[in-house]
């Protein structure tokens, strides 16, 4: 698995965590098996007695759907921003002015 594949898989895992409740049961099952449990398309197809192409199409469409949700709701983007601010705060625990700036940034995200 290349670096880009790993980055995409990590992003899809996060997007799935944020938006899985908006998906159908079939979409959740396919995404969970493919991205979280690392099943191959063939293994998923065999499990659900469908073609590899059907699984691929469903995963691709569902990936597009969660990306669309993210474009509208920005839950993952805000999560990443908060995580970066928290990391920065940990580095500046002795600098109260910096900490105040970071707290203000967090408040603006909400």
From Swiss-Prot:
Origin: domain of life: Bacteria
SUPFAM superfamilies: Sigma3 and sigma4 domains of RNA polymerase sigma factors (SSF88659)
Pfam families: UPF0122
Function description: Might take part in the signal recognition particle (SRP) pathway. This is inferred from the conservation of its genetic proximity to ftsY/ffh. May be a regulatory protein.
Family from the record: Belongs to the UPF0122 family.
Protein name in the entry: UPF0122 protein SH1678
The organism of origin for this protein: Staphylococcus haemolyticus (strain JCSC1435)
Taxonomic lineage of the native organism: Bacteria, Bacillati, Bacillota, Bacilli, Bacillales
